[in-house]
Protein backbone atom coordinates (compact mmCIF):
# COMPACT_ATOMS: atom_id res chain seq x y z
CA UNK A 1 0.00 0.00 0.00
CA UNK A 2 2.68 2.46 -1.13
CA UNK A 3 2.35 6.06 -2.14
CA UNK A 4 4.72 7.92 -4.41
CA UNK A 5 7.99 9.47 -3.30
CA UNK A 6 7.55 13.15 -2.44
CA UNK A 7 9.68 15.77 -4.15
CA UNK A 8 12.76 17.22 -2.45
CA UNK A 9 11.26 20.47 -1.18
CA UNK A 10 13.90 20.91 1.55
CA UNK A 11 16.66 21.17 -1.10
CA UNK A 12 19.38 21.06 1.58
CA UNK A 13 18.08 24.30 3.12
CA UNK A 14 18.97 23.12 6.62
CA UNK A 15 18.41 26.46 8.36
CA UNK A 16 15.03 27.17 9.95
CA UNK A 17 13.93 30.58 11.26
CA UNK A 18 11.65 29.21 14.00
CA UNK A 19 10.87 26.01 15.89
CA UNK A 20 8.62 23.47 14.15
CA UNK A 21 9.23 24.94 10.70
CA UNK A 22 11.40 22.14 9.26
CA UNK A 23 11.75 18.64 10.63
CA UNK A 24 13.92 15.75 9.38
CA UNK A 25 13.65 12.04 10.16
CA UNK A 26 15.37 8.73 9.42
CA UNK A 27 16.04 5.34 11.02
CA UNK A 28 19.34 3.98 12.30
CA UNK A 29 20.34 0.52 13.49
CA UNK A 30 22.32 -0.66 16.53
CA UNK A 31 23.34 -4.11 17.76
CA UNK A 32 23.55 -5.39 21.33
CA UNK A 33 23.56 -8.84 22.86
CA UNK A 34 23.12 -10.49 19.48
CA UNK A 35 19.99 -8.44 18.73
CA UNK A 36 19.23 -5.29 16.78
CA UNK A 37 17.69 -2.05 17.96
CA UNK A 38 16.26 0.59 15.62
CA UNK A 39 15.93 4.28 16.46
CA UNK A 40 13.46 6.50 14.62
CA UNK A 41 13.79 10.19 15.65
CA UNK A 42 12.48 13.54 14.39
CA UNK A 43 15.00 16.41 14.51
CA UNK A 44 13.98 20.08 14.38
CA UNK A 45 16.30 21.99 12.03
CA UNK A 46 15.80 25.20 14.05
CA UNK A 47 17.93 24.00 16.97
CA UNK A 48 18.85 20.36 16.37
CA UNK A 49 16.44 19.21 19.07
CA UNK A 50 15.07 15.67 18.86
CA UNK A 51 11.36 16.48 19.23
CA UNK A 52 10.19 12.85 19.17
CA UNK A 53 11.74 9.40 19.00
CA UNK A 54 10.88 5.73 19.25
CA UNK A 55 12.93 2.55 19.44
CA UNK A 56 12.05 -1.03 18.50
CA UNK A 57 13.73 -4.36 17.71
CA UNK A 58 12.42 -4.28 14.13
CA UNK A 59 12.16 -1.37 11.65
CA UNK A 60 8.40 -1.70 11.24
CA UNK A 61 5.60 0.56 10.06
CA UNK A 62 4.46 0.65 13.71
CA UNK A 63 7.82 2.11 14.87
CA UNK A 64 7.53 5.02 12.45
CA UNK A 65 3.83 5.52 13.20
CA UNK A 66 4.49 5.81 16.95
CA UNK A 67 7.35 8.26 16.32
CA UNK A 68 5.19 10.37 14.01
CA UNK A 69 2.29 10.44 16.48
CA UNK A 70 4.62 11.68 19.23
CA UNK A 71 5.90 14.38 16.91
CA UNK A 72 2.40 15.46 15.90
CA UNK A 73 1.28 15.56 19.55
CA UNK A 74 4.15 17.95 20.35
CA UNK A 75 2.91 20.56 17.86
CA UNK A 76 1.08 23.66 19.02
CA UNK A 77 -2.01 24.93 17.22
CA UNK A 78 -1.11 26.14 13.73
CA UNK A 79 2.38 24.58 13.63
CA UNK A 80 2.81 22.66 10.37
CA UNK A 81 6.46 21.75 9.81
CA UNK A 82 7.85 20.43 6.56
CA UNK A 83 8.89 16.82 7.30
CA UNK A 84 11.85 15.55 5.30
CA UNK A 85 13.07 11.94 5.04
CA UNK A 86 14.77 9.63 2.59
CA UNK A 87 12.69 7.54 0.18
CA UNK A 88 12.50 4.55 2.56
CA UNK A 89 9.35 2.46 2.35
CA UNK A 90 8.26 3.59 5.85
CA UNK A 91 7.75 7.12 4.55
CA UNK A 92 5.88 6.07 1.40
CA UNK A 93 3.22 4.02 3.19
CA UNK A 94 -0.22 5.50 2.57
CA UNK A 95 -1.09 5.66 6.30
CA UNK A 96 2.07 7.71 7.01
CA UNK A 97 1.42 10.08 4.12
CA UNK A 98 -2.25 10.43 5.15
CA UNK A 99 -1.29 11.23 8.75
CA UNK A 100 0.93 14.08 7.49
CA UNK A 101 -1.71 15.38 5.09
CA UNK A 102 -4.44 15.25 7.76
CA UNK A 103 -2.39 17.58 9.96
CA UNK A 104 -1.44 19.85 7.05
CA UNK A 105 2.25 18.91 7.06
CA UNK A 106 4.16 18.95 3.78
CA UNK A 107 6.28 15.90 3.00
CA UNK A 108 9.73 16.23 1.43
CA UNK A 109 12.11 13.44 0.42
CA UNK A 110 15.78 13.16 -0.45
CA UNK A 111 16.66 12.24 -4.00
CA UNK A 112 17.15 8.52 -4.40
CA UNK A 113 20.35 7.27 -2.76
CA UNK A 114 21.53 10.76 -1.81
CA UNK A 115 22.37 10.84 1.92
CA UNK A 116 23.65 14.45 1.70
CA UNK A 117 20.03 15.55 1.19
CA UNK A 118 19.45 14.55 4.83
CA UNK A 119 22.91 15.48 6.16
CA UNK A 120 21.75 16.94 9.50
CA UNK A 121 20.03 13.70 10.50
CA UNK A 122 23.08 11.67 9.41
CA UNK A 123 25.23 14.05 11.45
CA UNK A 124 23.11 13.46 14.57
CA UNK A 125 23.41 9.69 14.13
CA UNK A 126 27.18 10.13 13.81
CA UNK A 127 27.42 12.05 17.12
CA UNK A 128 25.10 9.60 18.86
CA UNK A 129 27.09 6.55 17.81
CA UNK A 130 30.48 8.18 18.41
CA UNK A 131 29.57 9.44 21.88
CA UNK A 132 27.51 6.61 23.38
CA UNK A 133 27.69 3.49 21.20
CA UNK A 134 31.08 2.76 19.63
CA UNK A 135 33.73 1.35 22.00
CA UNK A 136 31.02 0.30 24.46
CA UNK A 137 29.73 -3.19 24.95
CA UNK A 138 26.02 -3.26 25.69
CA UNK A 139 24.97 -6.64 27.06
CA UNK A 140 21.31 -6.33 26.10
CA UNK A 141 18.96 -4.37 23.89
CA UNK A 142 17.29 -2.99 27.06
CA UNK A 143 20.60 -1.60 28.31
CA UNK A 144 21.28 -0.05 24.90
CA UNK A 145 17.76 1.38 24.68
CA UNK A 146 18.19 3.06 28.08
CA UNK A 147 21.51 4.52 26.93
CA UNK A 148 19.93 5.87 23.72
CA UNK A 149 17.09 7.49 25.68
CA UNK A 150 19.54 9.03 28.16
CA UNK A 151 21.74 10.31 25.36
CA UNK A 152 18.85 12.00 23.54
CA UNK A 153 17.76 13.70 26.78
CA UNK A 154 21.38 14.85 27.25
CA UNK A 155 21.58 15.98 23.59
CA UNK A 156 18.43 18.08 23.94
CA UNK A 157 18.94 19.56 27.40
CA UNK A 158 22.66 19.63 28.19
CA UNK A 159 24.89 19.18 25.14
CA UNK A 160 25.94 22.65 24.02
CA UNK A 161 26.29 23.54 20.36
CA UNK A 162 28.61 26.30 19.19
CA UNK A 163 26.20 27.04 16.33
CA UNK A 164 23.58 27.88 19.01
CA UNK A 165 25.90 30.30 20.82
CA UNK A 166 26.97 27.70 23.38
CA UNK A 167 23.43 26.77 24.39
CA UNK A 168 21.77 23.36 24.31
CA UNK A 169 18.88 22.89 21.84
CA UNK A 170 16.23 23.26 24.58
CA UNK A 171 17.94 26.36 26.04
CA UNK A 172 18.13 27.90 22.56
CA UNK A 173 14.43 27.27 21.87
CA UNK A 174 13.50 28.65 25.31
CA UNK A 175 15.51 31.85 24.69
CA UNK A 176 13.87 32.24 21.27
CA UNK A 177 10.38 31.81 22.74
CA UNK A 178 11.09 34.31 25.54
CA UNK A 179 12.27 36.89 23.00
CA UNK A 180 9.27 36.25 20.73
Region annotations inferred by a language model:
Residues 1-180:
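Charged DNA-binding/catalytic regions of mobile-element recombinases
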Amino acid sequence: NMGLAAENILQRQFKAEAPCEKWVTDITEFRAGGQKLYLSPILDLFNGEIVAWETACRPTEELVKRMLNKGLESLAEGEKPLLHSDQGWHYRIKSYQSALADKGLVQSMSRKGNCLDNAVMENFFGHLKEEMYYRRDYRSVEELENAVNEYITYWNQKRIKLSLGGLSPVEYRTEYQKAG
